[in-house]
């Protein structure tokens, strides 16, 4: 019994306030640390100080590695730093890293879930040299087409914006690379809901672009991108370019083909394989993945597979009026010029 009373007394002591006597200091706790000393230096074992700061190239490489971070803010800030580095570099100076090294890290961000990351990515792509982008068009297009057929409406719009930039930078390479013509047109028709005769029986309605408050702005962007794409693929060639090419090919000779009719058809063709579309001795092939290097080949495929669907879609878009109707007028203008010019000579 005595031990239990002692334990109760000790427990009760913890909750009693100690009475301080005059002239005596308060008792210090057991975990008290004396901080009254003064030191001239403080040494940290894990501190690393360098006389020189990291170079701009090292910082550029570091931010490239941060593009795969799980944080949306980190990816956006890294893209902003890379964009600033590219814009502020001296004229005609090489990039800190070649485009072939940057693209494998940048391209997956086309499908990023964060809109701020995709917006900053487009700014970075526009800061890259156009000449360096032309050689990597086949590497860019699969990601763009994946974004154009994405389930999220904002990602589809961002992918269309990237495609518009790519056509402005390297339009000839986009429409002539393997799969760049038919596959991209199929993506446009899928987004716009302009189905061909084969797919109209089972395909659904036009893909949605999100909230109705957008007032047709996404649709306008898609139509504008389609107009630029068709202009690059089957648009009427510039007559001045044709004249200059003729002068370069035959200097000092003017109008030598006057007595002949369709003289270009009897000359050595400029294409590497002018009769490849006939597939005389080859095996059955995939038309969607082929390269259509000449305007004649692209117009032939467009007329056979897409012309009817595009014309029907333009009529329905023109009936909507407003900005969508004006955007469809731009596509109609390009289409009329292409049809008037025909397959060319």
UniProtKB/Swiss-Prot annotation:
Pfam families reported in the protein's UniProt record: Ipi1_N (PF12333)
UniProt record similarity statement: Belongs to the IPI1/TEX10 family.
Composition bias type Basic residues, residue spans: 1-11
Keywords linked to the UniProt accession: Nucleus, Ribosome biogenesis, rRNA processing
Entry annotated with the keyword Nucleotide-binding: no
Biological processes annotated in GO: rRNA processing
Function per UniProt: Component of the RIX1 complex required for processing of ITS2 sequences from 35S pre-rRNA.
Transmembrane segments: none
Encoding gene (name): ipi1
Subcellular location: Nucleus
Residue ranges, annotated region (Disordered): 1-30
Organism listed in the record: Aspergillus fumigatus (strain ATCC MYA-4609 / CBS 101355 / FGSC A1100 / Af293) (Neosartorya fumigata)
Entry GO terms, CC: nucleus; rixosome complex
Entries under SUPFAM superfamilies matching the protein: ARM repeat (SSF48371)
Subunit comment: Component of the RIX1 complex, composed of ipi1, rix1/ipi2 and ipi3 in a 1:2:2 stoichiometry. The complex interacts (via rix1) with mdn1 (via its hexameric AAA ATPase ring) and the pre-60S ribosome particles.
Name by which UniProt lists this protein: Pre-rRNA-processing protein ipi1
